[in-house]
Amino acid sequence: MPSGSENLPRVSFIMPTLNVEALLDNCLASIARQSYPRDRYEIILADAHSTDRTREIAKTYGAVVLDDDGKNMEEGKRLALQHATGEFIVFVDADNEITHADYIELAVKSLAANPQALGVESYYLPSPKMSSFCAYLTHLLHISDPIAWLMSANPILVARDGEIERWILPGDSLSYPLGANGFVFRRADLESVKVGEHFQDTHAALHLMRAGKREWLRVRGRGVHHYYVQTLWGFVKKRRRATVHFLQVQEETKTNWMKEKPQVPLWLAAIYCVTFVGPVWHTLRGLVRDRDARWLWHLPACLGGVLGNAWAVWTYKTRRGEKNLVAKLKPEQTLK
């Protein structure tokens, strides 16, 4: 990669927002701490007409704020992408905090040195600002949902070169959600799978893997603190919203990472969550292997996930034609 600030590739941070004043300053401050030169990156918010201080906070960090009239946050990302000028695209959400000042610098350098990789995935690291439940979801599960965690293929570490790790999925499985929470793409790769026409972050990575880019990178010990949700009830509401969004997307496209040879099918993952035996076994395994008491959240989270998904199906069927339904279902998110 070229040396000198003026020769560094431009980076665009893309973020959809809606009434996130409780989280946004924490997120944007972590971007401001990056070692990457400020004149070589831009921050673009697609804001769905927030009524709190979201826009005011964004502008104090020099962010470009766009009016997002779309029906969900993925449409907001597509809008922001249309205005982005960066060679590299970083998808962040307001509930993310980048953990290390050199993360973006290392991510961009690693992608420049590894053209075979589709992008850079964040590690999700615990933080004093999150509850033990949040740390269980994001740090221990990484996928933030027991059902998706059970279905996802287990990535394999291919090689490590200093701080940079190369990962791939086993066999011909593509069942692993990639693309959000600090994920770094090349703009050219995103354009190659036509994200400007229809965008879903996990679909972009899936299309790239189908096109032959099976490998992705991680920067060892670096990524984001993901303040996904702090409470079990908040998790139930979060799963409700996410599943309603998923069902809406499935009306438009049948692309679905959960159908790409998952470890277990969806129906079996749901049964696992309500039969207690599997969750208890994984709880005990986690307690022994990791010596981490946060695994005690696994059984309640399994039940909460099923409840949230069932509630989502009912919501989708009874409120299907309601305008901006996904936005209305947004649960409150805070730091601890």
Region locations from a protein language model:
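Short aromatic/hydrophobic "clamp" motif used to bind/position activated sugar donors
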Residues: 89
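Conserved donor NDP-sugar-binding/catalytic core segment of glycosyltransferases
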Residues: 97, 101-146
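A conserved acidic beta->alpha catalytic loop
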Residues: 46-55, 96-97
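Non-catalytic, C-terminal membrane-associated alpha-helical segments of glycosyltransferases
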Residues: 240-244, 258-336
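A short, conserved alpha-helix in the catalytic core of glycosyltransferases
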Residues: 178, 182-183, 188-189, 197-222, ...
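Short, acidic, metal-binding catalytic loop of nucleotide-sugar glycosyltransferases
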Residues: 30-40
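Glycine-rich, basic loop-to-helix element that forms the pyrophosphate-binding segment
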Residues: 68-84, 106
